[in-house]
Amino acid sequence: MTEVEKYIAQFEPSIQEKLHALRATFYDVLPHTQESIRYKMPAFTVGKHHLYFAAYKKHIGFYPVYGLTEIEHEIAPFRAPKTKDSLHFKLDKPLPLELIRKIILSKSLQMQ
């Protein structure tokens, strides 16, 4: 079991399902990415940079998400209060996987 799999396994099944879907989306968009745990959360390597996600009591956080003006209107509803670079996906709502796919692709192009 990888460190990311161990991270996901600590949560209840409904949250695990969302985290597995998010992880799979990273690999769909970036099949050669490498995953690790950094800052106590799953991290996916993009060039010399990383994209992260983490589960919390009421949401899944996704970081860093800035500089994507072309899709900001889609991202805005998920912007975390008082931050410029993180998104919060509420646990009681479906994950917007198509939007997450766009974000990963856009950030990967930006981070190369």
Where are these regions (language model features)?
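Charge-dense, helix-prone N-terminal extensions
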Residues: 1-112
